[in-house]
Every structure is written in C-alpha cells, then in structure tokens.
C-alpha cells in the first residue's frame, strides 16, 4: 500500500453522533496512534465536522453518496445502496487501500457488507462478533463471541468461534494460552441441549485451543475464562444485559454517595475511585467489537459511540492489524487440517 503506517477506513456517516464524534475520535487516533485515517462519507458534512483551521490537505476524505440508516433492512440496503459509506469503506479494504474498517452504524449492514465484499476466511462457515467484557480481575478481560451475528449456531460454528477467539485473545489482548469456555446451564459435560453437548465434545477434541469446560452465566465475569463462546442470540442478550447492569451500578453509586458537607468531603475522595470503576465497566474503554471470520479486519462500534469509543476502536483495529490476527487465524486452520 506504499506506507508502513496502518491505514483505517472509517465509516464517518455511521452512528447516532455521526459525523461529528466519529471525526473527533478519528483525528485523535491519527495524532496519538500514528495511523492514517480515511474518512468515508459526505465530504461537506465531514468538512463541517472538522475543527476550525484544520489543514484539509492532511485529512483524507473518501466520498460516499449514501448512508444506511439504522431502521433499514441491512442486506437489502447494502445491495441497493452500492455507494453507501459502509460499502465504500469495505471496498477500500478489498482493494488494499486500507488495512481495516470501522463503523458505528448499522451492525447488520456492516456484517452484510463485509460478507459480500470481503468474503469469509478459508475454513470459516460463519463470522462472529466478538466483544470484550470486564471481569472482577483488573486487567483481565474476557472475549465473548458470538454477540449477534448468528442467531442459530451449529456445534461446528461454535468450535470455529473458539479458534478465532483464542487467536484474538492471544495476539491482541496478550493472553497466554487463553482459557476457552462454552456458555451453558451447568458445568457438567452432559449439560445443555443436544447442540451444546455436541459442541462441548468438538471443543474438547480440538488440540488448537485450551478448552477448560462449560461456563455458567455466573462465570462470565469471574476472570476464570479468557474466551467464552455462545450463539448470537444468547450472546446479544448477555451483552445488552451487561451494559444495563453496568449503567445501573454506576447510577446507584452516584445516588448513594454521602450528602451534605461531610458527604461532599467524602465524595471528593471517592470520585477517583468512581472514575476507575466507570473505566472498568464502560464499553467505551474497548471501543468496538471485532467481526471475526471475514477476510479483513472489521470493527463494529456501538451506535451511541462518541469520540473516546471511536479512538479506542481504532486503537484495537490497529493492534489487530499489527499483530496479524487474520493470518494467525488462517494458520490455525492450516495446522488443524494438517493434523486432521
């Protein structure tokens, strides 16, 4: 691509706060991370969102004629709006003009666009959306996948999620021999429905992963597992519930801080602790979820993402590119086929 710096295509029109917050987070990433940013979307809106006195010669804008709204049916919209910002961003990766893509827009549209334009990695039947959850062990997150790409999953898909998740956990999150669990209703091997039992057997027999058994709901945030696999229906419910619980806990802490003069003094001492709690629980700290299994680095952000989330998502995308996550996943499947 003519440059050693990581180039990231940003869907500047995707998200509740686009393009303003998207542009702000992207410019911060350009300055602090040394990445090259390609802002994809309506040039007039993007330029209007730039800070005053911005040197336009230093900002690369890739025009896109349309955007996909959150209420549109994703597959039809992606096919109908060929020049939509998410499609143009994906094309930049396909044409090797960008190393990764990020969008805080319609997650279904991002997945559909990635599949249609980039395709799947060899050996992967279904892509999965993987997101990072905090745990009770500081600095030890858990990667949960799938959290929304596949409502129904065959046991083989869950095995593939485990392989991909292990590669991401090891090479991006820095986990040594990631411990993999299967989300289930009990610890015993025989627990769960037929699909869960068969998935358990496949995971147990796969020598490419460090499968340590079933994970119950109470285990997800325990820090005992590094990767947890489940179907996208359960995973999405888990994700939305965890986000809601985090917001409730933070609100309760704010309401229960002591009142009055003594309370104000106490609150002054507690504020740094509250800030650290928020940082550990806030999804903005991780920025986005990686769409694993497609032939390109693709991060999907929360629709409500603001500049800090955008920055962190770009940081994670850069780490995924730098650590060659796609190549690592492919090599795992080559080894598996050879050993099989």
From Swiss-Prot:
UniProt GO cellular component terms: cytoplasm
GO biological process: fatty acid biosynthetic process; phospholipid biosynthetic process
Enzyme class: transferase
Family stated for the protein in its record: Belongs to the PlsX family.
Pfam families registered for this protein in UniProt: FA_synthesis (PF02504)
Self-association and partners: Homodimer. Probably interacts with PlsY.
GO molecular function: phosphate:acyl-[acyl carrier protein] acyltransferase activity
SUPFAM superfamilies xref list: Isocitrate/Isopropylmalate dehydrogenase-like
HAMAP family attached to this UniProt entry: PlsX (MF_00019)
Keyword Lipid metabolism: yes
Catalytic activity: a fatty acyl-[ACP] + phosphate = an acyl phosphate + holo-[ACP]
The name this protein goes by in its record: Phosphate acyltransferase
Gene: plsX
Organism annotation: Nostoc punctiforme (strain ATCC 29133 / PCC 73102)
Keyword Cytoplasm: yes
